[in-house]
From Swiss-Prot:
The chain crosses the membrane at residues 84-104. PANTHER family: MITOCHONDRIAL IMPORT INNER MEMBRANE TRANSLOCASE SUBUNIT TIM21. Residues 36-83 are mitochondrial matrix. GO terms for biological process: protein import into mitochondrial matrix. Pfam families: TIM21. It is a single-pass membrane protein. It comes from Aspergillus fumigatus (strain ATCC MYA-4609 / CBS 101355 / FGSC A1100 / Af293). Essential component of the TIM23 complex, a complex that mediates the translocation of transit peptide-containing proteins across the mitochondrial inner membrane. Required to keep the TOM and the TIM23 complexes in close contact. At some point, it is released from the TOM23 complex to allow protein translocation into the mitochondrial matrix. GO terms for cellular component: TIM23 mitochondrial import inner membrane translocase complex. Belongs to the TIM21 family. Its main location: mitochondrion. The keyword Protein transport applies. Keywords: Membrane, Mitochondrion, Mitochondrion inner membrane, Protein transport, Transit peptide, Translocation, Transmembrane, Transmembrane helix, Transport. This is Mitochondrial import inner membrane translocase subunit tim21.
């Protein structure tokens, strides 16, 4: 057995031993306190800061601020925005009314050209003389000016409107009809008397090539009227 006197000496200076044996908890506590202090300072400064109020303009006003919170310039901006919104609403209402008026006068009104066209087509389909020439009424089609393409048959009907010397309105139109047997042209001439607001037929006829004209409506001239107005070979109107 080795003698204790021969063991290596492990003597450590007293000052160094004291440093090694000193606990490190106080230093960690100091760091924790320092971090907590900095966090408290940061939180305190954030809690005291208030969000910056956005200026109200004509384009950015969303109504979040009350009228009393606005400055003079912002009140002018809000009033301008509300005026513009009102003008947009009025313009939209006027345009909508104009569209409905146009649809009524051009499509749904009994005096419209579309209405009279549909009425004339129905008269052709209901007349036995016309169906004898054209074929089955269920297969009769009516369209505008004839073209080489079947996709262009929905063209506007050729129509003219004018007033005579007495101030009476006249409407003339012609359109094509086609059935399984033949095709033809429908001639329409209507007049609106001064004392009425409805169109009256002066002529409604169907022309089919190779056949006599089929007259569905033709106004009869009042006897003696033409002779009374004709003086020295001149027809007075």
């Amino acid at each position: 057995m080795m003698s204790p006197h021969l063991l290596p000496s492990t003597s450590i200076p007293k000052a160094s031993a004291a440093l090694l044996l000193r606990p490190a908890f106080p230093r960690m506590t100091t760091l924790t306190r320092f971090y907590a202090t900095q966090s408290d300072l940061g939180g305190g400064s954030g809690s005291k800061a208030t969000p910056r109020r956005r200026n109200v303009t004509v384009l950015s006003d969303d109504g979040r601020y009350e009228w009393g919170e606005l400055s003079g310039r912002e009140k002018v901006a809000r009033a301008t925005q509300q005026s513009l919104n009102f003008l947009v609403i009025v313009a939209g209402a006027v345009l909508t009314g104009g569209v409905f008026y146009l649809l009524y006068t051009e499509v749904f009104s009994p005096n419209s050209r579309t209405w009279q066209f549909e009425k004339a087509v129905q008269r052709i389909k209901d007349d036995p003389r016309c169906t004898d020439l054209l074929g089955d009424r269920r297969e009769i089609k009516a369209y505008g000016e004839s073209t080489g393409s079947r996709w262009e048959r929905n063209r506007p009907i050729a129509t003219s409107m004018f007033k005579d010397r007495q101030g009476r309105e006249h409407m003339k139109m012609h359109f094509h009809v086609e059935g399984p047997l033949n095709s033809g042209i429908v001639i329409v001439h209507m007049m609106k008397p001064l004392d009425k607001d409805e169109w009256e037929y002066l002529l409604l006829a169907l022309d089919v090539k190779g056949h006599s004209r089929v007259i569905l409506e033709q106004a009869q001239e009042k006897p003696g009227v033409a002779k009374a107005l004709k003086i020295f070979g001149i027809q007075w109107r």
